[in-house]
Amino acid sequence: MRNDDDQEEKKTELPLGKETEANLFKSRSIFIYGTITQELAQKVCSQLVALAAASDDDIRLFVNSPGGHVESGDSIHDMIKFVKPKVWTIGTGWVASAGALIYVAAPKEQRLCLPNTRFLLHQPSGGTRGMASDIEIQAREIIKMNERLNRIFSEATGQPVDKIAKDTDRDYWLGAEEAKAYGLVSRIVTSIAEI
């Protein structure tokens, strides 16, 4: 049964959504909120390319994510470095796992966070089933991924690779000030005027 009130509500929501998207495009702002997925990576990479095509002005990328699919995070990380405009990453809420990988794609001086942001670094994890030989292949791949991520975080923070490996052996939580001291964050900001 069709409900005309529901149809009318959807019609009124659509322009607001388009208007909000247009305003975000004009402000050159992208939001990564939630789990990192292939779908989110496609959306964010498309937005980065579209904003880069529109102008060379700086882009602001807000990150609030529990992490997710590492390869999708890699895609966004690499695209941030690939586009011509400067990309500022601004952490808010929590920046964890693959979300932290995306966050550190910007040069240190372009990595900011809000005061209550929490960061989580840790080893990649995964589950596999199947034949022993396939499980062995997956184990080797996750070890390679862990070593690669340790190198990325070492380069981004200035911390030695062995320290990153030790710290991320288990969940490694940092508040905003701790993340700044660790080299993840350059500045803690409280207003958009500070960006």
Swiss-Prot record:
Its main location: cytoplasm. It catalyses: Hydrolysis of proteins to small peptides in the presence of ATP and magnesium. alpha-casein is the usual test substrate. In the absence of ATP, only oligopeptides shorter than five residues are hydrolyzed (such as succinyl-Leu-Tyr-|-NHMec, and Leu-Tyr-Leu-|-Tyr-Trp, in which cleavage of the -Tyr-|-Leu- and -Tyr-|-Trp bonds also occurs). The active site is at residues 97, 122. Belongs to the peptidase S14 family. Keywords: Cytoplasm, Hydrolase, Protease, Serine protease. This is ATP-dependent Clp protease proteolytic subunit 3. One of its GO terms (biological process) is protein quality control for misfolded or incompletely synthesized proteins. Its EC number is 3.4.21.92. NCBIfam families: PRK12553.1. HAMAP family: ClpP. Fourteen ClpP subunits assemble into 2 heptameric rings which stack back to back to give a disk-like structure with a central cavity, resembling the structure of eukaryotic proteasomes. InterPro entries: ClpP (IPR001907), ClpP/crotonase-like_dom_sf (IPR029045), ClpP/TepA (IPR023562), ClpP_His_AS (IPR033135). It is found in: Cytoplasm. One of its GO terms (cellular component) is cytoplasm.
